A protein has these predicted regions:
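Short N-terminal edge-element motif at the start of the domain
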Residues: 1-24, 47
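A short, structured beta-strand/loop element
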Residues: 26-48, 114-118
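Short, low-complexity cationic-aromatic patches
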Residues: 28-33, 58-59, 107-109, 131-138
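Intrinsic, low-complexity N-terminal interaction/targeting segments
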Residues: 37, 80-117
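A cross-kingdom feature marking solvent-exposed beta-strand/loop segments within repeated
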Residues: 43-58, 123-134
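Compact, well-ordered interaction domains used in eukaryotic information-processing assemblies
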Residues: 45-49, 56-78
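Short glycine-rich, low-complexity/disordered patches
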Residues: 74-94, 154-171
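Mixed-charge, glycine-accented linear interaction segment located at domain edges/termini
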Residues: 120-180
Length: 180
């Protein structure tokens, strides 16, 4: 999956990062690492040209992605509300605070149903800010895409792993045998 939105001053790319699975000692498939939805923001360097070498990346967890998708739903009043996510990849370690990222969504003030996505990153004192307006149609497409991807990043629709998980768990009535 690769969905992109291109505007005059910035671009947004949406990508699926699948979860990874492994087989435990009893032959059950378990999720090793949850997937996510990767948002990549690039500033413009000219007409229809974007500097992807200076891109900012923000990986939405399944819970963050679900919240964002629900806030994107134009039939709900929640689109008028702001939503903001903050990540510090070094949190709890010696590099805490050296890289921080935030993603903020807020409704366009003109009431058209569009939103602004604002990405901010501070990396060793250097700042990157990329703002992208997302039209009503793009909001609708983004909402549908994210809602479709959330179960997949949680591992529910990976056919190989689910087949393996379901077949290994059928011999046991314990729901914990699914490994999720």
């Amino acid at each position: 999956v690769d969905f992109s939105i291109y505007k005059s001053k910035s671009a947004l790319s949406v990508k699926l990062v699948k979860p990874t699975f492994e087989t435990d000692s009893q032959g059950r498939t378990i999720m090793k690492r949850s997937g996510g939805i990767l948002l990549e923001f690039a500033p413009s360097i000219g007409t229809r040209k974007y500097d992807w070498t200076r891109k900012g990346s923000f990986m939405l967890s399944p819970i963050e992605a679900a919240e964002l998708a629900n806030r994107l739903n134009p039939s709900r009043q929640s689109i008028a509300q702001k939503v903001e996510f903050f990540h510090d990849p070094g949190m709890g370690g010696s590099s805490q605070g050296s890289v921080t990222k935030s993603l903020k969504m807020e409704a366009m003030p003109d009431g058209t149903g569009g939103v602004f996505l604002n990405y901010s990153q501070t990396k060793f004192g250097e700042k990157l800010n990329v703002n992208i307006p997302v039209s009503f149609g793009e909001v609708s497409a983004l909402e549908l895409l994210i809602k479709h991807l959330v179960p997949r990043v949680m591992g529910f629709f990976d056919e190989d792993s689910m087949t393996s998980s379901l077949s290994s768990s059928s011999s046991s009535s314990n729901s914990a045998s699914y490994g999720y």
